[in-house]
């Protein structure tokens, strides 16, 4: 039996940050008719997969994110239907999609198990469930956890995904890949974190020197910049 890959393994495939759309295409192939991206945020990944999937729908509970996604799709001339909807209560009939996707979103679901059950419900027989999640390990995770610790929610998402096996879903593939994240400075990373969620400011303010020291200690130094490998897991499941 092939041993499980660990986040520090050198054999984990290295991909440029932002190459997850190409990775999805490699796994899903061309010609899929209809895909749903659950928790799509501002829709960058969703717009990317529209290049090789016939009809693409993206949903998110945040109206602001959906408005930005629609504006970007219009500006780029990409045909994607963005809707405000919860991943735990999807407004489609059983078996409506032949691909359902969680791209870095399953751990953000209030109830991952319920969201996965809904995903399985709207997935057609023979369809593919594509789940990409950041792994709760490695130096980037350690550095970021000081202001946004997602260890518990990522673990809960992983447990929920595995609990679906044998309930009409089977795992076709499990892949680990790493992307290099490079920041010009600590302040560059801080700005990135605050853009993601302003609520993280309180963590920075509580121990500014400690957060900075920890971040810089964990980073690789590359030409005066601070770099990390972030590890992602991509699971591809099929519906019988």
Describe each model-derived feature in a short phrase:
Residues 88-99:
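A short acidic, Gly/Pro-enriched loop at the edge of an enzyme's catalytic core
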Residues 36, 42-89:
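Class I SAM-dependent methyltransferase SAM/SAH-binding core
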Residues 128-156:
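Conserved class I S-adenosyl-L-methionine
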Residues 2-16:
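Class I SAM-dependent methyltransferase Rossmann-like catalytic core
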Residues 112, 168-240:
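Conserved Class I S-adenosyl-L-methionine
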């Amino acid at each position: 039996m092939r041993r499980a890959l660990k986040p520090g393994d050198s054999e984990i495939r290295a991909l440029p940050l932002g190459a997850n759309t190409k990775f999805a295409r490699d796994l899903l192939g061309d010609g899929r008719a209809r895909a749903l991206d659950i928790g799509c945020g501002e829709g960058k990944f969703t717009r990317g997969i529209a290049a090789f999937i016939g009809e693409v729908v993206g949903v998110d509970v945040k109206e602001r994110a959906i408005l930005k996604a629609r504006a970007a799709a219009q500006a780029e001339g990409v045909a994607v239907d963005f809707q405000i909807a919860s991943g735990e209560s999807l407004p489609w009939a059983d078996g409506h999609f032949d691909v359902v996707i969680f791209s870095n979103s399953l751990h953000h679901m209030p109830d991952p198990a319920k969201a996965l059950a809904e995903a399985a419900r709207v997935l057609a027989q023979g369809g593919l469930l594509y789940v990409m999640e950041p792994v709760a390990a490695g130096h980037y995770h350690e550095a970021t956890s000081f202001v946004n610790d997602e260890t518990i929610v990522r673990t809960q998402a992983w447990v929920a995904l595995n609990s679906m096996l044998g309930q009409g879903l089977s795992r076709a593939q499990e892949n680990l890949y790493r992307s290099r994240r490079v920041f010009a400075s600590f302040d560059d990373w801080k700005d990135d974190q605050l853009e993601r969620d302003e609520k993280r400011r309180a963590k920075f303010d509580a121990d500014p020197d400690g957060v900075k020291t920890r971040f810089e200690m964990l980073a690789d130094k590359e030409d005066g910049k601070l770099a990390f490998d972030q590890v992602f897991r991509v699971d591809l499941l099929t519906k019988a």
